[in-house]
């Protein structure tokens, strides 16, 4: 075993594990405050996940006000107030501008580099690190964080399995290893094992912002590639057959209505865009609802109902259909559907309603019209599972926030250990929130190390 210990250097030595968004900012800020900083990245390149974020455009942050911003993290959002107080959106944008990155605001408040190129952001952070003389070591895997008497002493690392282990002395370690998604970028969940080995509790990991697999794979395949805009996705804690139609109450009042079952619990309901894939459903609104659906699956069956005409209530849709049938009575059922649905959904709808495709509109009975309306308001799928964690955009779960001081990002168990980014139990919707959390917690961890 070889040692790497600074000789004649009175500065505090900080080892940052992980060269992603939070790790780079943490390393640069700690060095800026006077520490000797060694940044360890197990892949051959810094910022690999940053380079693919936002479809390689890098959705840096969001323009929403602080209160709305915090709400995007759910019940754990309050944990971030301290980090955002030290380093928030304007601070991030000012830092990037200092290194030549201009930004722009797009729909939903999403902020991107003006160049639409994540490489410009990664290059800016690399210049930030170089300016403050951060020692960067790529292709180095940390195998253990060393502790004595509940205090950090350093880390063990090695280049590969055949190389000798190297002990790096450290006064402090910032764990910035990210989550367990996008493993090709180096995010393979190593940090969870390191933290657990030191006694930290790991909140169970689940995929978040992830497409969902349905049981009705043949139906999904028949609609594969269909993109749906301005639809409402409703998720229920029940099998699809147990969802009442649109005429049922929208929520269970505890009383129900005569002749009908109370509507099952609604897990979540969102309006937006989604798509049908060969295995199930994806797209923005699906991703945003996925974590609640994943968590609900642990408690029993989950189904979804797609409202393809959310702007119309049940009676309005019935009237719309009747008007179409009256005005175009000689048109076939297939041609009527062509005015209501994307092309690839027409044949599945014909099969599901059981109405002959060539039946003239004026011959469609009231019961058949109700069947059509029912499908338009509630196209149902049973959810089998999410895609694997490796296919998710972010990881839900991680190091328990109860064991981290939100004022400093310091471990409450081990002196000299700090956390930042996705390794902690923090996750949010898409829109730049997860990157901002990584940047802000990385900055606060570095500030705290300096203190």
Describe the role of every protein-language-model region.
Residues 15-17, 155, 167-181, 195-196, ...:
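Short hydrophobic core segments
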Residues 137-140, 144, 347-427:
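A glycine-rich dinucleotide-binding beta-alpha-beta segment and adjacent secondary-structure elements
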Residues 43-46, 51-52, 66-67, 201-204, ...:
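An anion/pyrophosphate-binding glycine-rich loop and adjacent beta-alpha core
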Residues 172-218:
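Glycine-rich loop(s) and the adjacent beta-strand/alpha-helix scaffold that form part
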Residues 146-167, 173:
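Conserved beta-strand-loop-beta-strand element in the redox core of flavoprotein oxidoreductases
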Residues 10-12, 161-172, 269-272:
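Core beta-strand elements of the Rossmann-like FAD/NAD(P) dinucleotide-binding domain
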Residues 31-55:
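Glycine-rich FAD pyrophosphate-binding loop
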Residues 12-39, 445-450:
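N-terminal Rossmann-like FAD-binding beta1-loop-alpha1 element of flavoenzymes
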């Amino acid at each position: 075993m070889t040692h790497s210990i600074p000789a004649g250097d009175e500065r505090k030595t900080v080892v940052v594990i992980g060269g992603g968004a939070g790790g780079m900012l943490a390393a640069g800020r700690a060095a800026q405050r006077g520490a000797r900083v060694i940044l360890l990245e197990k892949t051959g390149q810094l910022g690999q996940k940053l380079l693919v974020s936002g479809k390689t455009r890098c959705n840096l942050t969001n323009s929403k006000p602080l209160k709305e911003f915090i709400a995007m993290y759910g019940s754990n959002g309050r944990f971030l107030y301290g980090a955002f107080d030290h380093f928030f959106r304007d601070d991030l944008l000012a830092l990037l501008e200092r290194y030549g990155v201009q930004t722009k605001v797009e729909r939903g408040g999403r902020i991107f580099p003006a160049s639409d190129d994540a490489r410009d952001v990664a290059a800016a952070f690399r210049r930030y690190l170089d300016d403050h003389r951060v020692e960067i070591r790529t292709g180095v895997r940390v195998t253990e964080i060393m502790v004595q008497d509940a205090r950090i002493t350093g880390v063990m690392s090695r280049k590969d399995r055949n190389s000798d282990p190297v002990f790096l002395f450290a006064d402090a370690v910032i764990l910035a290893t990210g989550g367990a998604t996008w493993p090709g970028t180096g995010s393979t969940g190593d940090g969870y094992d390191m933290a657990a080995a030191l006694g930290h509790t790991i909140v169970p990991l689940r995929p978040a912002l992830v497409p969902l697999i349905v049981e009705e794979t043949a139906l999904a395949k028949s609609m594969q590639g269909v993109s749906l805009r301005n639809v409402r996705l409703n998720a229920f804690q029940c099998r699809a057959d147990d969802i009442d139609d649109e005429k049922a109450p929208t929520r269970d009042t505890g009383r129900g209505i005569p002749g009908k079952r109370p509507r099952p619990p609604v897990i979540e309901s969102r309006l937006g865009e989604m798509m049908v894939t060969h295995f199930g459903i994806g797209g923005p609104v699906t991703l945003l609802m996925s974590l609640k659906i994943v968590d609900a699956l642990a408690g029993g069956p989950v189904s979804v109902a797609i409202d393809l005409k959310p702007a119309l209530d049940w009676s309005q849709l019935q009237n719309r259909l009747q008007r179409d049938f009256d005005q175009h009575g000689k048109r076939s059922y297939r041609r009527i559907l062509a005015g209501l649905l994307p092309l690839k959904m027409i044949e599945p709808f014909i099969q599901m309603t059981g109405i002959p495709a060539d039946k003239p509109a004026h011959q469609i009975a009231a019961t058949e019209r109700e069947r059509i309306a029912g499908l338009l308001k509630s196209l149902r799928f049973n959810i089998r599972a999410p895609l694997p964690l490796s296919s998710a955009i972010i990881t839900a779960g991680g190091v328990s926030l109860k064991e981290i001081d939100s004022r400093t990002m310091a471990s409450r168990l081990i002196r000299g250990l700090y956390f930042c980014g996705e390794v902690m139990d923090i996750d949010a919707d898409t829109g730049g929130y997860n990157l901002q959390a990584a940047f802000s917690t990385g900055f606060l961890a570095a500030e705290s190390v300096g203190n």
